[in-house]
A protein has these predicted regions:
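Short, intrinsically disordered low-complexity segments enriched in Ser/Thr with adjacent Pro
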Residues: 2-11
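Serine residues within intrinsically disordered or low-complexity segments
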Residues: 7, 21-22, 38, 42
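Aromatic (phenylalanine/tyrosine) cluster motif
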Residues: 23, 33-35, 55
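Bacterial N-terminal signal peptides that target proteins for export
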Residues: 41-57
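Hydrophobic h-region of N-terminal signal peptides that target proteins for export
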Residues: 59-67
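Cell-envelope and extracellular/periplasmic
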Residues: 69-443
């Protein structure tokens, strides 16, 4: 398959290459004849060989020109707190524990541990902290010290495509699909009968409450789509890849769900078969609306399916009471990817497969250790202890429960709660890489 010439400039440069090649052959015709005579080889054979080499060289040059001229791909990352990312930079060292994530560390830290940027990935991120732009680095998470899926995704995509890319990120913590990201074609959220009766019991004005909810419906949908349009319009001016480049919207990642999963008012039958069907319908409509509003009817979309806690089948006994709710919601999130109308253009990624079961077990043991520490410190014998003695008691209990290696693994791997994927850089980078692999399969 021959490379495609994308512009008149490419045609002109290729023509120049061919003209030079022809001139070289003409200039070397007499020396080639003498060489062929001395080597007892036909001039036609040598001439044909040089033509073939010249042709291949021209194709190679054209391939390079085609890569340079091809539009720069732009990917949108949108969702709530886990798309923001709560993995603290102090957990980055744990990336080295996994061959999949280990190479990422060298992209954001040099040999001395100082932070560096990945110049091939440009980011425009809108979140609760405002607008942040620049080359991909630590700090595009929920705060300056945190990362989200953008790190693993950006590194993997730019390497796989072997060209610069742009990420447009829009994420806010605590946001729902049923109201905050509600697709415009679904109309404003309307309270169900159970919610109306609850409002009346609380002595609240139902009409006023409905008006407030209607006003909030789709607010963050509009925020995110406006951010995408504005960012695309400014890329030629702001991105470091040159004003002469073209940019094309190439894919979108949706990573949200917690606020819908825990809302028993909106989903009163949650945990029951079909209890989250409304979420599936809303997400299907959201995808259609997004494609229409972004003028990208076949935009590849990856659904990041909620997976905090890991696979439900591996839940401990104390987690089993959540199993039905968690699994039914995950199934509802993934459902749109199974629709025939979205075949080959929407894929679901089960982020539960990126979970770290070792960290789960260590965190579980830490809870019991903390309970033991609190009980001992409240005992009559411990009330008279000084600060140093209390610290010694904590250390004694810790060493009884954990080896030093286990304790180091826990401290270097966890920085947040389970619903934020433990604030683990290793988990978050795995998720980003998984998103990239799914996206690459659709490009």
């Amino acid at each position: 398959m021959h490379p495609v010439v994308d512009s008149k400039g490419d045609h002109d440069r290729l023509l120049h290459i061919v003209q030079i090649s022809s001139y070289v052959l003409l200039c070397w015709k007499q020396p080639l004849y003498l060489f062929a005579h001395s080597m007892k080889t036909s001039l036609a054979t040598i001439h044909r060989t040089i033509q073939q080499v010249t042709y291949m060289a021209a194709l190679s040059c054209l391939a390079l020109l085609s890569v340079e001229a091809s539009p720069i791909k732009v990917f949108v990352l949108v969702g709530q707190s886990n798309m923001q990312g709560h993995a603290h930079e102090r957990t980055l060292g744990a990336l080295l524990e996994d061959p999949l994530t280990a190479p990422i560390l060298g992209k954001v830290r040099d040999a001395q541990g100082a932070a560096i940027s990945l110049d091939r990935v440009w980011v425009s991120s809108l979140s609760s902290g405002g607008l942040l732009k620049g080359s991909l680095r630590i700090g595009f998470g929920a705060s300056d010290e945190k990362i989200g899926p953008e790190l693993g995704f950006g590194v993997r995509m730019s390497e796989a495509l072997n060209q610069p890319i742009v990420l447009i990120k829009a994420a806010w913590g605590g946001k729902s699909l049923h109201t905050d990201f509600r697709p415009p074609s679904s109309g404003p959220y309307r309270f169900n009968e159970t919610q109306i009766q609850q409002l009346k019991k609380q002595g609240k004005d139902v009409e006023e409450a409905q008006s407030i909810r209607s006003e909030a419906s789709g607010f963050f949908y509009r925020q995110f789509t406006d951010h995408v349009h504005q960012s695309m319009n400014l890329l030629k001016e702001e991105s470091p890849f040159g004003a002469d480049k073209e940019y094309t919207l190439s894919g979108l990642i949706w990573f949200q769900g917690w606020n819908d999963m825990v809302d028993r008012g909106v989903y009163p039958e949650r945990g029951q078969p079909g209890g989250y069907d409304d979420y599936s319908r809303l997400l299907e409509q959201w995808i259609r609306d997004v494609r229409q509003d972004l003028n990208a009817p076949l935009l590849p979309i990856v659904i990041g399916v909620m997976g905090a806690g890991g696979p439900v089948a591996l839940y401990r006994e104390d987690q089993q009471r959540y199993s039905a709710i968690h699994q039914s919601f995950r199934d509802a999130m993934a459902a749109p990817a199974q629709l025939a109308s979205f075949k080959s253009t929407v894929k679901a990624v089960l982020t539960e497969n990126c979970w770290d079961m070792e960290l789960t077990e260590l965190r579980y043991r830490e809870r019991f250790m903390n309970q033991e520490i609190q009980a001992r410190l409240k005992s009559d014998d411990a009330r008279q202890l000084g600060k140093d003695e209390k610290d010694a008691l904590r250390l004694e209990i810790r060493q009884k429960n954990f080896s030093q290696e286990e304790w180091d693994t826990l401290q270097s791997g966890v920085s947040n709660a389970e619903y934020h994927y433990l604030g683990s850089a290793k988990i978050m980078v795995r998720i980003g890489i998984s998103f990239a692999q799914a996206m690459l399969s659709m490009l």
